[in-house]
Curated annotation (Swiss-Prot):
Family designation: Belongs to the complex I 49 kDa subunit family.
UniProt name for this protein: NADH-quinone oxidoreductase subunit D
Membrane topology category: Peripheral membrane protein
Catalysed reactions listed for this entry: a quinone + NADH + 5 H(+)(in) = a quinol + NAD(+) + 4 H(+)(out)
Organism: Chlorobaculum parvum (strain DSM 263 / NCIMB 8327) (Chlorobium vibrioforme subsp. thiosulfatophilum)
Listed EC numbers: 7.1.1.-
Length: 400
């Protein structure tokens, strides 16, 4: 690495590399300090504890401690029938319940080998993309407030409220929806669904541009995030990263494009990745940038779905839902692109029971958080807040 700055004295040599990591060589025999960050800390986005070993203000190692929000999700699934698991999935990533429900239902439908009505497919994608935008607004708003910018937080939650009202109008709930069911939906959308969703798209498009100018192009925000927590593409792949974290490292991988499901093969949209002109590829700013740009792509997807969604009088989205779900014996893995990455479910059926023998959830947040040691080593302690915020973790999904 190229050395950007070097300070020497008789007893200490401090070097800052081009990725802003700091190395300290010294002749003094000093002890490292151990700092416990969390489990109740404003920047941890939930009950996460980090044990940080520091050399002065430089992080030597940051070890995450998990499990404070463990609720036995996978064990509960063994004692609940297949449809009864849907509400539990809402409570994993509670900021993206529609996406969590979709991933689970796709997996069971794959095991049952059933076909879903086209109208249902389009409604599922529209509600999931609305939820994706709402989730990214939380990620961006809370990231801003982590770094001391309060106004963008208010802008994000102002616009998110429009989506929450829409989803409540469609499903009856603001966060824990229980709307996407195996084989269909809980019920059809209201009569003026297309009109209200189209109005939101028209409203939000200039607001997304406004937010980009307010925060992403803000000089102070750029200084706090550019070059911090760099993760090279090959290392990100080895850690099995996915979602905005992987795309922030320059890898163009999105399950909606690379392993498409539902009606995504029929839709035209881009997969944003940083080009290195505005940010250093793989840094905190790149990960934020991907989320900011993805919101516009979600708007494009919603518009196309509104145009293509078939109108059906007297449509019953529950008509194809079997009253008793008893899949054939076998196992299946299904996955979908959640706002934080690949959310997958591995389900085992014995062919006799209406309950799964095993239901394993693959959490993107858990996998992304596993790289915390590599991301934080050599960084300054104040930059740890920027690194945690850039991961966009939801501890309900991490701990399950």
């Amino acid at each position: 690495m190229q050395e950007l700055g070097k300070v020497e004295s008789n007893s200490i040599r401090v070097t800052r590399q081009d990725d802003k990591r700091i190395t300290i060589e010294k002749d003094l025999d000093t002890e490292h300090m151990v700092l416990s960050m969390g489990p109740q800390h404003p920047s941890t986005h939930g009950v996460l504890r980090l044990e940080c070993i520091t050399d002065g203000e430089v992080i030597v190692e940051a070890e995450p401690y998990l499990g404070y929000l463990h609720r036995c999700f996978e064990k509960h699934c063994e004692n609940v029938d297949y449809p009864g698991i849907v509400p539990y999935t809402d409570r994993m990533d509670y900021l993206a319940g529609m996406n969590s429900e979709l991933a689970y239902c796709l997996t069971v439908e794959k095991l049952l080998d059933i076909e879903i009505p086209r109208r249902v497919e389009f409604i599922r994608v529209i509600t999931s993309e609305l939820n994706r935008i709402a989730s990214h607004l939380v990620a961006i708003g809370t990231y801003a407030i982590d770094l001391g910018a309060f106004t963008p937080f208010l802008f994000c939650f102002r616009d998110r409220e429009h989506i929450m009202n829409l989803l409540e109008w469609i499903s009856g709930a603001r966060m824990l929806y229980n709307y996407i069911w195996i084989g269909g939906l809980a019920y059809d959308v209201p009569a003026d669904f297309k009109k209200r969703v189209a109005e939101f798209v028209t409203y939000f498009r200039p607001k997304a541009v406004e937010l980009y100018k307010l925060l992403t192009e803000n000089e102070i925000f750029v200084k706090r995030t550019k070059g911090i927590g760099i993760m090279p593409a090959d290392v990100a792949i080895n850690f099995a990263w996915s979602g905005p974290m992987l795309r922030g490292s320059g890898v163009k991988w999105d399950l909606r494009r690379n392993d498409p499901y539902s009606v995504y093969p029929e839709l035209d949209f881009e997969v944003p990745v940083p080009d290195g002109k505005f940010s250093d590829v793989g840094d905190c700013l790149s990960r934020h940038l991907v989320r900011a740009l993805e919101m516009e792509e979600s708007l494009k997807i919603i518009e196309q779905c509104l145009d293509k969604m078939p109108e059906e009088q007297g449509f019953d989205p529950r008509a194809l839902i079997p009253k008793k779900i008893r899949p054939k014996a076998g196992e299946v893995y299904g996955r979908a692109e959640n706002p934080r990455g690949e959310l997958g479910y591995y389900i085992v059926s014995d062919g006799k029971s209406t309950k799964p023998v095993r239901c394993k959830a693959r959490s993107s947040c858990f996998v992304n958080l596993a790289a915390m040691k590599d991301l934080s080593k050599g960084q300054l302690l104040p930059d740890l807040v920027a690194i945690i915020g850039s991961i966009d973790i939801v501890l309900g999904e991490v701990d399950r």
